[in-house]
Each structure stands twice: as C-alpha cells, then as structure tokens.
C-alpha cells in the first residue's frame, strides 16, 4: 500500500492538496507542501507526520522543530505555530491531523483535554515503527480509496491512540482538565470570546473588545492570552478560518459568496487568507474534500 501512495503522488506532483478527509473526528489532510504558512493556531489536537519528500520544519511557539520520517511535530490546541518551507529543498508530503477533542473523548474521557494547552508535553517526538506504519497506511488508503470514510476513521482511531499513548502524559489528564477550566475562567474574557465567535468582519477593532471587557488594551491582551493561550488577533483568525472551512465543506455557495459572508472586501483577499492558513486555496480545498463524499 505504501508503494502505491508514492506512485500516485508522483503522478500528480502539481497538486498541493492530495486528499482531505473530514467527519466527526475533524479533518485529515494529505498535503504536498512547497511554501510556508503564517503563524496561526487551531482549536484541535494537531499532529503532523511526514509521508515523503524532503525533511522540513515547523515553528511551535518560538522554537523550530524538525519534521522527518523519524520525528513528528505535536501542536497543542491554541498553540501558535507556523510552517517554514525551504525553497531550495524539494516539496514535502505531510499528513496533517486536526482532531476534535470531543471525538477523542469517546476513547478515554480524559482525552477531552486534547484541545487544551499542555496535552502534549513536548512539540516534537520520535516516531515509533507502529506510528510510522499506521500513518503510511492511512495516507495510502486515502489516496487509493478517497471515499472510504469508515475505513479512514478506523485507521485514524488506531493512529491517534498510538500517538497519544506515546507522546501525551495521559494519566495526568484529569488535572489537565481542571487546568483548562481555570485558564478560561475569567468571565470578561468568556464574554468577549462569545462576541468574537459571532464576528466575521476581518477589520474588527481589538480596542472595541478591550472596551467591552472594561479593561485597558494592555491588560486585555495579557488577560486574553493567559486565559486562551493565543493573542486576540490570532484567536480572531482561528475563528474566521474555522468558519471558512465549515462553509467550504458544508455549503454549496460560491467562493465569492462565502467571501462576502465572512466580510472580506475582495475574493482574492479571502483566497490569500485561506491559503496562508491551510496551505491550499478554498477552491482546491473544496474540490479535494469532495472526493471523500
């Protein structure tokens, strides 16, 4: 199965999104990457595994971590990170997992903490032969059978269990859940977050949110980041990106109409925003994701 993946990838070397699977588990993207991504975050348990191509790297927090056949990159929920592509190197095929904490909770209740800071104790870890094999088999099956959703979810279950049991201190997760509750406990920040989640205008003024919280701009920024884990601007971009992904997966509206819904002044601005965060444009994202339908 692994060899089939390599042949098919080489046949469509111009693609940037090879496959995208989606469901209750979240998203799994098989990406052929040749450019960097802006600093961003996700509300998911985020795991990055190299499939083939050049070794590469991600910045997690403020530190660079390698992504190779032997090392995975592990990103906690709301942890800022970016992809750093070396233009002098060949492309890299990456299996990117964006996993919903609610789905993981079905395996162990404590795994609800997978969307919280501190779930993975370190952003990098050595890939075991089992994890490598499971990742390659999932990538191969997504390439060969893009619409086999049940098989993909089953393979993903095995992979995520292996990843979490190897890289996360799962026996301490009840404490992580209490910590997660404490970190988001300030009622002023919760109220602002609710407003932000209803906000779609790219030009939202952060001073307005500080005023709503009854805080100075500096105090608001400090309290927001200590409560949520990311600065307000990054959080707004996360919300807008998740709205965009949901629209591309679940709406039949045109990219232009979705761009207008989300408050972008030009479809080109929306496309650039989407590509800078996801690695592919919205049209390609929708086209490839429909292979899994």
Which residues make up each language-model segment?
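N-terminal amphipathic/basic-hydrophobic helices that include classical n-h-c signal peptides
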Residues: 1-8
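Residues that scaffold the ATP/ADP-binding catalytic core of kinase and kinase-like folds
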Residues: 106-108, 235, 285
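N-terminal regulatory/effector-sensing and dimerization cores
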Residues: 13-116, 144-149
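Short, Lys/Arg-enriched, Trp-marked, Pro/Gly-tolerant hinge/linker segments that flank
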Residues: 115-132, 141-202, 206-213, 226-234, ...
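Terminal helix-turn-helix DNA-binding modules in bacterial transcription factors
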Residues: 194-210, 215, 225-267, 271, ...
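Short hydrophobic/aromatic patch on the recognition helix
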Residues: 70, 219-224, 269-270, 274
